């Protein structure tokens, strides 16, 4: 499947759709470093899409199998640093059992365990980590402002995983989910600028401004 380009962002963003749940697998680069977000199911397809580029980091927004299924193979093939939240990392790397609502997947070592408020530098990109429970206990969003991208006139970017979608939010009825926590997470995201481009784990990209009048109004 061909890579699709996300336009008007402050960094280079493109994506593949993988797996039966149609996960968005993002490739993000500032021209120096490259990261892949949520390698869903096919590491070989991701390698072909990289087309020889060095992969610096693999970011896992949460512990569900449709977001981490190819992480172990991709780490083995590239040597890239795997980053997940400190809360969800134990399930990803096999330190704790897979939750009852999660499908079995190949466990993957987590090289860096991020916490809320961390700033993670990948190349010249400096991503702010926002832990946003609700879908899972340790789900996280990553936020980047234009001064740390390679397109200063582009919009800020939010990697939202399964927290925020176009017109909706992630399910909260799985083990570790909580609508109360989801509402609090949405209120945190609502402080971001309207022009922020949202890169969700499934479905079409959106903006914070577009979701302010629908998703935030309904759920937050």
Predicted feature descriptions by range:
Residues 2-53, 141-160:
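Conserved beta-strand hairpin/beta-sheet module of binuclear metal-dependent hydrolase folds
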Residues 16, 114, 132:
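Hydrophobic residues at beta-strand termini and immediately following loops
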Residues 24-30, 91-92, 163-168:
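Short, basic/glycine-rich phosphate-binding loops at helix/coil junctions
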Residues 24-26, 112, 117-118, 140, ...:
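Residue-level detector of beta-strand structural context in well-folded domains
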Residues 28, 61, 132:
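Conserved S/T- and glycine-rich ATP-binding loop of Class I adenylate-forming
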Residues 34, 97-98, 126-220:
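Metallo-beta-lactamase
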Residues 39, 67-68, 182, 186:
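Aromatic/hydrophobic pocket-lining residues that form the small-molecule binding cavity
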Residues 41-125, 145-148, 214-217:
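Active-site HxH/HxHxD metal-binding segment of metal-dependent hydrolases
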């Amino acid at each position: 499947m061909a890579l699709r380009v996300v336009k008007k962002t402050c960094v280079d963003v493109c994506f593949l759709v993988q797996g039966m749940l149609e996960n968005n697998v993002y490739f993000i680069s500032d021209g120096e470093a490259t990261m892949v977000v949520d390698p869903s199911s096919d590491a070989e397809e991701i390698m072909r899409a990289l087309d020889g580029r060095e992969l610096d980091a693999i970011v896992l927004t949460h512990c569900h199998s449709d977001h981490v299924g190819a992480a172990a193979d991709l780490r083995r093939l590239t040597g890239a640093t795997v980053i997940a939240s400190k809360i969800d990392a134990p399930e990803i790397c096999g330190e704790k059992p897979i939750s009852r609502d999660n499908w079995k997947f190949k466990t993957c070592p987590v090289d860096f365990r991020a916490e809320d408020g961390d700033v993670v530098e990948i190349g010249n990109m400096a991503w702010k980590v926002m832990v946003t429970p609700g879908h899972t206990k340790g789900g996280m969003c990553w936020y980047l402002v234009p001064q740390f991208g390679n397109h200063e006139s582009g919009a800020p970017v939010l990697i939202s995983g399964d927290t925020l979608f176009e017109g909706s939010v992630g399910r909260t009825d799985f083990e570790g989910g909580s609508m109360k926590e989801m509402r609090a997470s949405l209120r945190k995201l609502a402080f971001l600028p309207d022009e922020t481009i949202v890169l969700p784990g499934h479905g079409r990209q959106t903006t914070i401004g577009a979701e302010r009048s629908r998703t935030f109004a309904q759920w937050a």
